[in-house]
Curated annotation (Swiss-Prot):
<dbReference type="GO" id="GO:0003735">
    <property type="term" value="F:structural constituent of ribosome"/>
</dbReference>
<feature type="region of interest" description="Disordered">
    <location>
        <begin position="1"/>
        <end position="22"/>
    </location>
</feature>
<dbReference type="Pfam" id="PF01016">
    <property type="entry name" value="Ribosomal_L27"/>
</dbReference>
<dbReference type="GO" id="GO:0006412">
    <property type="term" value="P:translation"/>
</dbReference>
<keyword id="KW-0687">Ribonucleoprotein</keyword>
<comment type="similarity">
    <text>Belongs to the bacterial ribosomal protein bL27 family.</text>
</comment>
<dbReference type="InterPro" id="IPR018261">
    <property type="entry name" value="Ribosomal_bL27_CS"/>
</dbReference>
<dbReference type="InterPro" id="IPR001684">
    <property type="entry name" value="Ribosomal_bL27"/>
</dbReference>
<dbReference type="GO" id="GO:0022625">
    <property type="term" value="C:cytosolic large ribosomal subunit"/>
</dbReference>
<protein>
    <recommendedName>
        <fullName>Large ribosomal subunit protein bL27</fullName>
    </recommendedName>
</protein>
<keyword id="KW-0689">Ribosomal protein</keyword>
Amino acid sequence: MAHKKAGGSTRNGRDSESKRLGVKRFGGESVLAGNIIVRQRGTKFHAGNNVGIGKDHTLFALTEGKVKFEVKGPKNRKFVSIEAE
């Protein structure tokens, strides 16, 4: 004879794996060519000088130097560029 009633099922208990998005190299940090600067969905940050953009909108360094974040343009867009050291 069962001492516990049969447990009902729940419809919760699932979640997707985190995607580890965000800024990986901050302003003033030194980077080498190929280093990932920002992982993002869409273009929250835009590519400036010496920065490339991947098919998933990842921003990466094209040359070595220091990372620089700036806001410019009429729409106040955030740009990431690399300045030579």
